[in-house]
A protein has these predicted regions:
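AlphaC helix of the eukaryotic protein kinase fold
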Residues: 74-105
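Activation-segment/catalytic-loop signature of the eukaryotic protein kinase fold
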Residues: 117-118
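Conserved short submotifs of the Hanks-type protein kinase catalytic core
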Residues: 121-136, 140
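Protein kinase catalytic-loop region centered on the HRD/HxD motif
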Residues: 160-172
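Conserved N-lobe loop of protein kinases adjacent to the ATP-binding glycine-rich P-loop
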Residues: 51-58, 65-69
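Activation segment signature within eukaryotic-like protein kinase domains
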Residues: 156-157
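Protein kinase glycine-rich loop
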Residues: 36-42, 47
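A short, low-complexity linker immediately N-terminal to eukaryotic Hanks-type protein kinase catalytic domains
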Residues: 16-35
Length: 175
């Protein structure tokens, strides 16, 4: 993959670095998406800030990277599965791609982050997600201590319920 020197969205220099084992800041995927800083990591993969290079807007990039099945990332950014885990790595990689392609078909459903693209590269899969900004629920709760009235909670979470219902309609189960 190529590497950009600055963000195509805001022009800011890519001076920062991501931790070892993650994609380097400035990596370009499919000639269209630039990887920014790592936001979080979980057992399924890594979440990065990103930018769409043509329309120059922000995106979030979710990379398939199952920690328990991945041995390393090569110097060329290619994921290498652990010895003996090759079949499971490939199967779960295909499941990850299928999941995000399914969500892409039902978005924009209320309450779901739109999946703009699914890119396969580096022996991995990247879900390119709409980045609307906003405040994560844990931060909102931290800034608004105390009890939330049930009616207010239902109003706030209604889009989430609708998104999960849309997923269930096509046979996806939220875990």
């Amino acid at each position: 993959p190529g590497a950009a020197q600055s963000c195509p969205h805001c022009g800011k220099s890519f001076a920062g670095r991501n931790p070892g084992g993650t994609l380097p800041v400035g990596t370009v995927l499919a000639g269209r998406y630039t990887v920014g800083e790592m936001l979080s990591i979980d057992g399924e993969g890594i979440l990065y800030r990103g930018a769409e290079n043509l329309g120059r807007f922000r995106v979030t990039i979710k990379e398939y990277l199952p920690i328990t099945l991945t041995a390393e990332r090569t110097a060329e950014s290619t994921l290498r599965p652990k010895t003996g885990s090759e079949v499971l790595f490939k199967t779960t990689r295909m499941d990850f791609a299928d999941l995000y392609r399914s969500i892409q078909r039902i978005t924009p459903a209320n309450g779901l982050e739109a999946v703009l693209d699914v890119v396969e590269a580096n022996n991995s899969v990247y879900a390119i997600l709409e980045n609307l900004g906003g405040t994560p629920l844990d931060q909102w709760l931290e800034n608004h201590p105390g009890t939330i009235r049930p009616d207010d909670a239902c109003t706030m979470l209604q889009p989430v319920f609708e998104g999960v219902a849309a997923m269930h309609k096509i046979g996806l189960v939220h875990r």
